[in-house]
Amino acid sequence: MELIEVILSKENLNRAYKKVVANKGAGGVDGVTVEELGNYIRENREKIIMSLRNRTYMPKPVRRVFIPKDNGKKRPLGIPTALDRTIQQAISQPISDIYEKIFSDYSYGFRPGRSCHDAIRQALEYLNEGYEWVVDIDIEQFFDKVNHDKLIQILREQVNDSTILNLIRKYLKAGVMENGLEKATIMGVPQGGPLSVVCSNVYLDKQDKELEYRGLRFTRYADDVLIFTKSEMAANRVMKSISNWLERKLFLKVNATKTKVVRPTRSKYLGFTFLKNGGEWKVKPTTEKKKKLKKKVSEYLKRGRAVARPLAATIKRKRSIK
């Protein structure tokens, strides 16, 4: 069965719809809410499927919103329409199944059964094996700078269906609506839709494979990657070589100011810092991470969810965040 037929199968579409409804989320540029999506699909199902199959379907632009980051800056998100989120989810499910078989064991972001805590554990394993120099690669505006042609070229290696590749390219080129004005998207994968997660992992899997080919120890969560070596000289050599490779092969710009070679105690990764205690490397949350945890617990208590918990357990939970 061709991949387009797998994607358009009743089972896959229903699973995608349920996932979008469960995630809730805001509406896109067409104003259709997730709550209204079911009726819209029932009324237009055959027309939507036909347009996807014959390549006439045109995704709508994403709606630009900004969310605050821990450092005080704002992260741009692109919110697809509820229908486009469903279609993106339907595409992502079988493509994820294809790539899960070949993704690196050292890639942890947005993959089933994996988390940032697994990435941290892997980092600790390297450190406790004696790889105590860290190469912190910072890719400048990764999600905004993904090269569309290169991404499609990479996808074509595993996705042998021109209809799906054509549809993915349409989503990449769908544009962004900001302050009532539509802007073209000539590069990048807007964060906010299911496809951006899959496409970003597919793109950076090429980096993972290069690091594995070179026999390097690394851990990656989305675009956050750390490489571990046993000497400062090796770390500096790796930093220069991998930075050049990323720019030459994946057309990504490495932030020269933020990319650095450091000792583990000077490194921050996924909200944690490393420290050596009794000859063993461990982690502790950064100050920013602690603030977020305290805020979450305070909100949790305000919502009254602690009522069902023993009072002592609730107090202990809040006091444990020092």
Annotate each predicted stretch with a short phrase.
Residues M1-R42, E46:
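Non-catalytic, polymerase-adjacent accessory regions of viral genome-replication enzymes
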Residues S9-K18, A174-T185, A256-T257, A312, ...:
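Short, hydrophobic/aliphatic alpha-helical segments
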Residues G27, G31-K101, F110:
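Active-site substrate-recognition loop segments, prototypically the cytochrome P450 B′-helix/B-C loop
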Residues Q93, I137-I139, F272:
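Residues immediately flanking
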